[in-house]
């Protein structure tokens, strides 16, 4: 036997599928349902001061489902015996797998050995014990009583991922007569990853703290703030994805801040700096990125710069994107200058590599990667339908580390959240067209 023979056998099968109760479910119905749910009672995540109903500036933002799209599909090898089991698997959570196998097979946990192999990409995808492939391998191994290798095809993996949750963001704000930002409201409508995985923990408590990360800790000095959350089950499997909810919330926050700066007639960098008196690490990250990017320099027609800053996983990152938008609305990212304050740095090259990887991954989700639902199933199957950023599309990237003696923070995820808002703000600077939906398509610039 070999893998190709198994794949040919799979393709030869004629299966009569039960399409289930969600056969008529599609992306439009999901969007409509989320919009309707947005009017429901929301759970408050943060409230400061007094929020009134007469806020004059409003914007709405949307972020689509997206896949982890790991280069190596899900796979494992398992050997099950009467009193022991041995598993070889690329995973980010070996202890959970060990416990689950022990429970499934009713054998002592000390008799379960999990070998963590090298993995062709994780990004949160390999945090799940039961992505079905391991439990399927166990059931097969029970029956054949021989070691079993189970491999998902790319199509299997793309259609049965645990996707980054889609989300809607409704933001409102007020500026004073002096154009100071005096009130901010952010309502997040999104599925809960934790609520889907452990619904028993959310029977009475409907606030998923993870879902408001990056929103409830808004760094700006605003006297009146309300951040709330509407948990919305879309019936689509969702999971942790690189930077988790920070990628959605940073996009909404930093594009709206840019809109407010424009409304106030203030430079986008200056507008942010004026509201970061209590956030020196945000300020220094912004200052460094802006300085290295040459913020404020004159650019040819059709080119623009945009910036964003965000804190996540104990680190701060600011990014300045420079883009070109052609007369045909084709978008090219020319350069991204990023700063990162991740505390004490042990391996600078490692930090820079992680930041570069985050930017590549962030550009894919900003410009390309989108999962849509048709007839109750994922429409995309492989990289011809779920496109990744290609080598010729990769911009020049410069990474600058903020010197710090603070405790170390993360490096593998904080570089991703600022990517989308920096690019969206740069497109506005180049074209005057606001971007409020991810991923960004050329057709979004045609209206």
Outline where the language-model segments fall.
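Cofactor-binding beta-sheet edge motifs in enzyme active sites
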Residues: 1-447
């Amino acid at each position: 036997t070999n893998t190709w023979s198994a794949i040919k056998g799979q393709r030869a099968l004629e299966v009569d599928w039960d399409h289930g109760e969600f056969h008529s479910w599609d992306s439009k119905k999901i969007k409509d349902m989320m919009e309707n749910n947005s009017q429901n009672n929301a759970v408050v995540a943060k409230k400061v001061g007094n929020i009134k109903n007469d806020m004059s500036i409003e914007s709405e933002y949307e972020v689509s489902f997206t896949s982890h799209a790991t280069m190596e599909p899900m796979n494992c090898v398992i050997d099950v015996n009467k009193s022991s089991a041995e598993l070889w698997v690329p995973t980010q959570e070996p202890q959970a797998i060990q416990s689950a196998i022990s429970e499934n097979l009713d054998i002592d946990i000390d008799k379960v050995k999990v070998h963590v192999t090298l993995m062709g990409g994780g990004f949160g995808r390999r945090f799940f014990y039961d992505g079905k492939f391991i439990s399927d391998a166990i059931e097969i191994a029970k029956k054949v009583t021989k070691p079993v290798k189970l491999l998902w095809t790319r199509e299997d993996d793309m259609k049965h991922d645990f996707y980054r949750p889609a989300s809607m963001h409704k933001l409102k704000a007020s500026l004073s007569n002096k154009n100071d930002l005096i009130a901010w409201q952010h309502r997040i409508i999104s599925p809960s990853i934790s609520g889907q995985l452990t619904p028993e923990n959310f029977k009475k408590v409907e606030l998923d703290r993870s879902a408001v990360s990056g929103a409830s800790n808004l760094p700006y000095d605003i006297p009146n703030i309300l951040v709330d959350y509407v948990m919305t089950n879309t019936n689509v499997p969702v999971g942790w994805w690189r930077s988790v909810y920070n990628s959605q919330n940073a996009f909404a926050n930093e594009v709206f801040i840019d809109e407010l700066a424009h409304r106030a007639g203030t430079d986008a960098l200056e507008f942010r700096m004026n509201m970061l008196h209590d956030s020196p690490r945000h300020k220094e990250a912004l200052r460094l990125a802006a300085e290295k990017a040459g913020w404020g320099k004159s650019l040819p027609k059709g080119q623009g710069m945009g910036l964003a800053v965000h804190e996540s996983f104990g680190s701060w990152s600011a990014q300045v994107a420079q883009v070109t938008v052609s007369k045909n609305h084709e978008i090219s990212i020319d350069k991204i200058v990023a700063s990162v304050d991740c505390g004490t740095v042990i391996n600078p090259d490692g930090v820079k590599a992680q930041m570069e990887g985050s930017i590549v991954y962030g550009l894919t989700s900003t410009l390309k990667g989108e999962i849509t639902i048709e007839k109750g199933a994922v429409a995309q199957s492989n990289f011809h339908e779920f496109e990744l950023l290609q080598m010729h599309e990769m911009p020049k990237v410069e990474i600058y580390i903020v010197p710090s003696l603070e405790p170390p923070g993360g490096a593998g995820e904080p570089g991703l959240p600022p990517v989308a808002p920096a690019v969206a703000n740069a497109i506005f600077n180049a074209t005057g067209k606001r971007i409020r939906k991810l991923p960004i398509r050329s057709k979004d610039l045609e209206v």
